[in-house]
Amino acid sequence: FKSPSWQQGGRYHSETYACVFELPNGDKYVAYRGTDDGGWIDNGQGMTQESTLLQREASDYFDQMAEQYGWTESDNIYVTGHSKGGNKAQYVTLMSNHANLVDECHSFDGQGFSDEAIQSFKEKYGEEGYQEVLKKMYGYNGANDYVNPLGNTIIPKENMKYIDTVPNPGSGFDKFAGLHMEEQMFQRDENGNAIAVLGEETEQGVMGKFSAFLSEFLMSLPPEERDAAAMFVMQIMELRDVGEGGGALGVDGTSLTSGDIYLFIERVLPKLLDAMLEEVLEKFGLDKEAAERLILLVKLWMIFASGKWEYKLVKALIDELKERLLEL
């Protein structure tokens, strides 16, 4: 364990959080941590922008380590991470200045990329070269993980595995969040402690498929609507994740705007409900009336769901409405 990013003289944001592990046999692993305070906003930006601040910092960190330790192509070098960390590892494998040194990328629940990012990858390598780099990438995802389907998945299907996971005990958001916890992907010893062996391989679960459906819908939107929707959803996750003691801004100071809220409610939400209705009709063969009742139940759940972020969101909407009324 050496050269952690948080000991580099303030060169990197705390959210970058990376370090190098060197094994006795000389193999080197560069590991990136997943989302923390400010990172959810960066996740949203990753669905609409060519690159994000945290992706670029992850790449910079890898290049710094490669130059500092004089790594060459004769070294065995692996990049890895969970969630946002997995996304960073993928980005490093493609876009770092020393990307040619990466032998393999192992992403755990790491999300995909925007159309704009993929275009930049292809511009750098050409189509054939891009496909060749992707062969280095391997994905390990919880069967019902809801993060890895976000954006455009670039890891080849033949290199992707879904792992049977157990949700957190309890109910509500905590149980839901457990579907994305890395420790749930590993087997347990007789004392219930996680060991360094992945759980049984399985197929993608219902929640994972539903997240993939939502992501496909989101990525099909015009850029302005896609940006508003991504910011809306990720702002909710940011508020929920940091709680009362944290902030609600991205690492670059970005946050949800009133324009994002307006676009999401007026243009994106109706399209989403229509898409969900069509999906229900197609997948389950329900008649339209039955499908509409199901959609109504989802809407009612959203309205009456309890929690601090819902209160903050409703308050923000009310404040926005008051401001608009005062302008009339």
Where are these regions (language model features)?
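Alpha/beta hydrolase fold serine-hydrolase catalytic domain that processes acyl esters and thioesters
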Residues: 2-28, 32-76, 96-328
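Gly/Ala-rich beta-loop-alpha elbow adjacent to hydrolase catalytic centers
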Residues: 81-85, 89
